[in-house]
């Protein structure tokens, strides 16, 4: 059996997502006011490239969702990924919170209508579009069977570019694990948890959108995804009660 073990998947995603949390939110918080949007985006992109290319993780729940929808990973693998990513996001945020002191910027949470961020409509649009773009890059790189280092480089570059775009809009989201971890430890930001839904739901929708766009430009078809006729038949059986 060549499938990675559940423990290995969880451990890899935990480590990879922790690296992303340190390279992104960690740099933003511990660097204080000296870290600009470009430096933060570079940190996010490099950390993602390291997580994919060296650790063997994808370090983002919407990446795992897209790979599952494209039949690149199994349901078991996707669930293992999500567990590891959530734990890594929380642990990474806890590390940053523990290292931080009162002289530094206290929060790297996402949001809107505060701290100089854009309004909700702009945030939702940006999160959706950038999620589609980054997922498209990942699926295109994987479907072309590029070397892992190339997948890591292209995906990391796309992720960093997206974060540079998003930094002034909402603090850089498109990664539910990153957003959840940061929100839990954003003790000085009362909006963080209440606004968290946008940074979980919208990127997930963007992952589906990225998959659909990928199907339009790739040689793959809908039958190569979980949305093939088998899914329709299974759903029909559930509704009608047929075995």
How would you describe each model-predicted region?
Residues 1-243:
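Membrane-interface helix-loop junctions and terminal tails of multi-pass membrane proteins
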